[in-house]
Design a protein with these regions (language model features):
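Extended, compositionally biased regions that are outside compact catalytic cores
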Residues: 1-277
């Protein structure tokens, strides 16, 4: 708060954007270290709030996704380290919420269709620290609802944003760029199922959302010159969700129940999509 006041209200010469940002980041790191040393959860929460508010309060109004999300990634990794050390599991859920809010904020303020590659990295890259924490938790037997929810929500957000991307600029005419986000998020959900087969319901959720996106694109945006893309996407969808149950049984033979009937619907849905054009 003092650093912010020195820059915004008092306009001290030293407190330019970069020095103020670095100082506030240092305060956040120090707060995490003190929280661990003093076993003080309040300090950790305050440090986290300061960390996520730093890029908001010091925004220059210019788009800098590398700086923003590089910083947020480091902040998330720091919070995950604190959670792993002290088992303050709710912090990882709060970190996920802060990350998603900043993702949506960036998308709402700065995203244009020409930045789709950046959006791919933002919405497919930012879930990785939480999925990594989920994998570590499964391996070390400290998995809990906070870690699980923090890993599940970001890929679902990516799929949710994909519905908006479908109607943004000319992205519907660039299915390769658009459906990279869609299938990438679907793969992240399937990765969680591989790590924890009891989350198999995510396969149907992800597949259902991908089918909905493919259907909307087919009915509202598909043109004759995109037919080859359409058939390629349908086949990719069918193969992914047809092969996955077999892959899961191979990787987790002792933990996977017989293949549920609903998983056989995806090939049929793909055939339905082929009939739509």
């Amino acid at each position: 708060a003092v650093s912010y006041a020195c820059r915004v209200f008092y306009h001290f010469a030293f407190f330019g954007p970069v020095p103020t940002f670095l100082l506030m980041a240092l305060v956040t790191v120090t707060a995490f270290a003190l929280a661990i040393r003093m076993d003080a959860q309040v300090v950790a929460v305050l440090g986290m709030l300061g960390g996520f508010l730093t890029p908001v309060m010091l925004s220059t109004g210019e788009d800098n996704p590398l700086g923003l999300f590089g910083y947020i990634t480091l902040l998330d990794l720091g919070l995950i380290a604190v959670v792993r050390r002290k088992r303050w599991d709710y912090l990882i859920g709060l970190a996920m919420v802060g990350t998603v809010v900043l993702q949506i904020g960036w998308w709402g303020k700065f995203f244009v269709a020409e930045n789709i590659v950046i959006a791919q990295r933002v919405f497919l890259g930012m879930p990785l620290p939480f999925i990594g924490a989920f994998a570590w938790a499964v391996r070390r037997d400290w998995l809990n609802r906070w870690v699980t929810v923090a890993a599940i929500i970001p890929p679902l957000v990516a799929l949710g944003v994909s519905f908006a991307l479908l109607f943004t600029g000319d992205l519907a005419a660039r299915p390769g760029a658009l459906f990279t986000v869609v299938f990438g998020a679907d793969l992240l959900l399937l990765a969680l199922v591989v790590l924890k087969p009891s989350l198999r319901w995510l396969e149907s959720v992800g597949g259902g959302l991908v089918f909905a996106l493919l259907s909307l694109w087919t009915l509202g945006k598909l043109s004759g010159d995109l037919l080859s893309w359409a058939f390629g996407l349908y086949i990719t969808f069918a193969l992914l969700h047809t092969v996955f149950p077999a892959v899961l049984r191979y990787l987790r033979p002792a933990e996977v129940a017989p293949t549920p009937l609903w998983s056989q619907f995806f090939p049929a849905l793909s055939l339905f999509l082929i009939l739509l054009p």
